[in-house]
């Protein structure tokens, strides 16, 4: 079994690959005494344990995450994970399909919000078809 430090190191590697060095550096710089344990926890558990598992590739994990964030209305996290989905190889067309599929199970208002957020993210994202 991996040590906490090994899990943290693996988690940081995956977290940086998925979210970008710049995003992770901003998160670390914003860490306070209140949030330090939280940052360690999400790095070890979310990124080191779950995102590092071999059962799904990162594209598939991004689809699962987008669907969940849309369903629960977590808009700030949705914007972050839309960018991550592009980094993980999803296309804008595939993300559109994820949002459309989510509308059936999460509702039209959830999809409306997701499409608005996706439009904003893609417009600002260098290299995406909507951001060129």
Q: What residue spans do the PLM features occupy?
A:
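Short alpha-helical scaffolding segments that buttress acidic/His motifs in well-ordered protein cores
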Residues: 42-46, 63-70, 98-103, 114
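Acidic, glycine/proline-rich low-complexity segments that act as flexible tails and inter-domain linkers
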Residues: 1-59, 87, 112-132
């Amino acid at each position: 079994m991996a040590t906490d430090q090994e899990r943290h190191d693996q988690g940081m590697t995956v977290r940086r690959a998925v979210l970008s060095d710049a995003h992770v550096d901003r998160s670390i710089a914003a860490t306070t005494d209140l949030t330090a344990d939280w940052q360690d926890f999400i790095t070890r558990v979310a990124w080191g344990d779950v995102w590092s598992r071999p059962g799904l590739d990162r594209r598939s994990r991004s689809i699962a995450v987008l669907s969940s964030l849309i369903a629960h209305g977590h808009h700030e996290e949705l914007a972050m994970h839309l960018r991550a989905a592009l980094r993980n190889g999803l296309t804008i067309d595939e993300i559109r399909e994820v949002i459309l599929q989510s509308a059936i199970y999460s509702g039209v208002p959830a999809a409306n919000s997701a499409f608005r957020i996706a439009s904003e993210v893609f417009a600002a994202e260098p290299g995406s078809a909507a951001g060129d």
